[in-house]
């Protein structure tokens, strides 16, 4: 699972899930052999009911994509998280992505017990998620060290913005797979021990993302990738990537659920230029398949 796409959840104008657009996104990833992460922050999981989340997992599994399907587990209630994992076990998913519980800001001991409680309920591979900007606390090195030998602990996704922290995760648990969780930092994190990328940008450009993950040090590619990644990061995710997908007609609508709004898109006037540059990627820099 070298490249996983952190999938959006597309919505119709009435805020219901747009399964037709969702299917297009999933098949575009299948075509390139990319795995998918459903119901992370990019998928607006906290804005969905349990029933809606299950419907997305069930739909994705029904397509028999034959690519890795990883499901996000978020929230603050341990019982709710355990119940959600139990629901997911009824489907042929391939793993879980689990952040530190949001809002509560646990210390090392509490965070470790939280993850251990969830790891003990599954034999699926689990990726621990460092996302301090949303969780309020980092994924502590001590937590990773304590859980690294657990049979269900598979990897770490690092979206903390620190290349040094990526190196520390790789050192403290060398047998775990470290994923870069920030598109713009992929080359640097790869050189510091990251073995894969969980990408937002690949929602719209799955083939180009696959090429870049496989060849992260080509300077011309890096400059373009950085420019696009930084534009996406100007706005809270997934606002910008939904704007791109709708502009390209990969999804029918750029609708988000509150408190997110497409009206908050930053530097919106650059959108046509962003899309045009990526359309030229394969012409300028051949994609390796």
From Swiss-Prot:
Record site: Part of a proton relay during catalysis: 41, 103
Binding site for pyruvate: 42, 198
Cross-referenced Gene3D superfamilies: Aldolase class I
Principal subcellular localisation of the protein: cytoplasm
Record key words, sorted: Amino-acid biosynthesis, Cytoplasm, Diaminopimelate biosynthesis, Lyase, Lysine biosynthesis, Schiff base
A GO CC term assigned to this protein in UniProt: cytosol
Primary enzyme class: lyase
PROSITE patterns (alphabetical): DHDPS_1, DHDPS_2
EC number per UniProt: 4.3.3.7
Catalytic activity as recorded in UniProt: L-aspartate 4-semialdehyde + pyruvate = (2S,4S)-4-hydroxy-2,3,4,5-tetrahydrodipicolinate + H2O + H(+)
Coiled coil region boundaries: none
Compartment(s) where it occurs, according to its Swiss-Prot or TrEMBL record: Cytoplasm
Pathway of action: Amino-acid biosynthesis; L-lysine biosynthesis via DAP pathway; (S)-tetrahydrodipicolinate from L-aspartate: step 3/4
Keyword Metal-binding: no
Signal sequence region: none
Keyword S-adenosyl-L-methionine on entry: no
GO BP, one annotated term: lysine biosynthetic process via diaminopimelate
GO terms, molecular function: 4-hydroxy-tetrahydrodipicolinate synthase activity
Active site: 129, 157
Pfam families documented for this protein: DHDPS
Assembly, per entry: Homotetramer; dimer of dimers.
Function: Catalyzes the condensation of (S)-aspartate-beta-semialdehyde [(S)-ASA] and pyruvate to 4-hydroxy-tetrahydrodipicolinate (HTPA).
Similarity comment: Belongs to the DapA family.
NCBIfam families: dapA
Protein name, per record: 4-hydroxy-tetrahydrodipicolinate synthase
Record organism: Chlamydia caviae (strain ATCC VR-813 / DSM 19441 / 03DC25 / GPIC)
